[in-house]
Amino acid sequence: MRHKVNREKTFTVITILCAVIIIGAIGLCLYTAIGHPEDAVYYAVVIAIMAFTILYVYLISPKAIEFNDTSLIMHKVVGKIIIPLEDIKEIRPYNQSGLRLFGSGGLFGSIGLFTNNDIGRHYEYVGDFSEAFLVVLNSGKKYVFSCENSDKVIEQVRSNIRN
């Protein structure tokens, strides 16, 4: 069963504002580069970095959570994280973020490596913290995901990891 990742309003507003600012900055760089062709390489590098950043964060953003008989799968725009059910030690609701170590704390959601006092280092792929849940693996690795009907996903995974 596949469940869509929803975006909370805060993340949607941050994404729109960041996109407007980055597009404006790219436009300003292009405008300035036209007047200063001797600095065109510098502006091209700045534009490439800004464009790559927004594209990369979009491509790794979460789109859906899928649950089947053998695994929990977090689908990104490009790629997926597959967690075999036998690797899951614990799954429970979890609605708080942490200190961002590497990633995005608002652009397309909360995505990347985070840490906090409660669960330590963990990876977040969250669109809406009111629908978030923590997955702890036997290896100690931790993920925070979110999706619609997260309570049903938690219940289904729990019933399958106990068997």
Q: Where in the sequence are the language-model features?
A:
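N-terminal membrane-targeting/pre-transmembrane regions
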Residues: 1-37, 134, 140-142
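Short aromatic/basic micro-patch
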Residues: 66, 82, 144-147
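Transmembrane alpha-helices and immediately adjacent membrane-cytoplasm interface residues
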Residues: 45-63
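Non-transmembrane, membrane-adjacent beta-strand/coil modules in membrane-associated proteins
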Residues: 2, 75-139
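Terminal membrane-proximal soluble interaction domains of membrane-associated proteins
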Residues: 131-160
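Short, surface-exposed linear segments at secondary-structure transitions and domain or protein termini
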Residues: 13, 91-97, 151-160
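Membrane-helix interface/capping segments
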Residues: 61-78, 85
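Hydrophobic alpha-helical transmembrane segments
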Residues: 36-48
